[in-house]
Amino acid sequence: MRQGIHPEYHKVIFLDTTTNFKFLSGSTKTSSETMEWEDGNEYPVIRLDISSDSHPFYTGRQKFAAADGRVERFNKKFGLKSSNDNE
């Protein structure tokens, strides 16, 4: 294999922001935010909106996140009423 063309592969902590579930895995993605893992080492943290801990397919039940959808956030940001408010 040619040297210098492949991204650097290292361990990172993936953090599900919905459930605060954390897991350590390998990735080419990196972050400036770090966290100490159970083994005492510091690893970069990648924040996730959804993971196997919070996705309904893997959990077998519906878990509704407290986060608003993109449209609701846009409407709230610009002070607009949503189409559901007219009913």
Curated annotation (Swiss-Prot):
- A GO molecular function held by the record: structural constituent of ribosome
Among the GO biological process terms of this entry, one is:
translation
Per the record, its GO cellular-component terms are: ribonucleoprotein complex; ribosome
Q: Name one Pfam family in it.
A: Ribosomal_L31
Read off the InterPro entries from this record: Ribosomal_bL28/bL31-like_sf (IPR034704), Ribosomal_bL31 (IPR002150), Ribosomal_bL31_B (IPR027493), Ribosomal_bL31_sf (IPR042105)
Q: Which UniProt keywords apply?
A: Ribonucleoprotein, Ribosomal protein
Question: Quaternary form?
Answer: Part of the 50S ribosomal subunit.
Q: Which NCBIfam families match?
A: L31, PRK01678.1
Q: Which family does it belong to?
A: Belongs to the bacterial ribosomal protein bL31 family. Type B subfamily.
> What PANTHER family does this protein's entry cite?
50S RIBOSOMAL PROTEIN L31, CHLOROPLASTIC (PTHR33280), LARGE RIBOSOMAL SUBUNIT PROTEIN BL31C (PTHR33280:SF1)
Q: State the name under which the record lists this protein.
A: Large ribosomal subunit protein bL31B
Native organism is Staphylococcus carnosus (strain TM300)
